Amino acid sequence: MTGFDRARIEAAVAEILAAVGEDPSRPGLSATPSRVADAYAEFFAGLGRDAEAELGEPVPLEQGQAETVILREISFRSVCEHHLLPFIGVAHVAYLPGEAVIGLGRIPRVIDTLAARPQVQERLTEQIADTFEAGAGARGVLVVLSAEHGCVTARGPRQVAATTVTLAARGEFAEPAARAELIALIGCGAA
């Protein structure tokens, strides 16, 4: 990650603690600025990284084109750029390979890279779909994310059971019939 300034983050966290009326040097809080900096280094590790590079080198198919590949229930976490609170959920990715396939382990790497930056779920969904369409040469892509947002569950409306579902479809999977079939296969309940 480029541009990560640990000292500034620690100073800013200490200032926030002081601004809410706490003593950042008291026992229990004295290490908090360092802990938050550690967490932010992890949360934002995708900044400056190329998600498409995470796809690796596609493996050419020996006999033309393959059928649909679906990887379901991929856990992810990101940080909402509006409140800097986490959103945590699962991703489902379906793609229709062109002349090559990508390693299944590469799919979560792409998601992790794109999620590890200040995000909104809607954009994250689109970025994942765009990465597979462009970087993997997929003829069709469908991405469904379902997540619980800290800004909905822990503050404001405090709806602890609320989930947000977003969907992005590209290529052949943008067709309504193909999209509906994949959603049924994924079994995630998205409309």
Swiss-Prot record:
Zn(2+) binds at C80, H83, C151. The keyword Nucleotide-binding applies. InterPro entries: GTP-CH-I_C/QueF, GTP-CH-I_N, GTP_CycHdrlase_I, GTP_CycHdrlase_I_CS, GTP_CycHdrlase_I_dom. The keyword Membrane does not apply. One of its GO terms (biological process) is tetrahydrofolate biosynthetic process. Pathway: Cofactor biosynthesis; 7,8-dihydroneopterin triphosphate biosynthesis; 7,8-dihydroneopterin triphosphate from GTP: step 1/1. One of its GO terms (molecular function) is GTP cyclohydrolase I activity. It catalyses: GTP + H2O = 7,8-dihydroneopterin 3'-triphosphate + formate + H(+). GO terms for cellular component: cytoplasm. HAMAP family: FolE. Belongs to the GTP cyclohydrolase I family. Toroid-shaped homodecamer, composed of two pentamers of five dimers. This is GTP cyclohydrolase 1. It comes from Leifsonia xyli subsp. xyli (strain CTCB07). The lineage of its organism: Bacteria, Bacillati, Actinomycetota, Actinomycetes, Micrococcales.
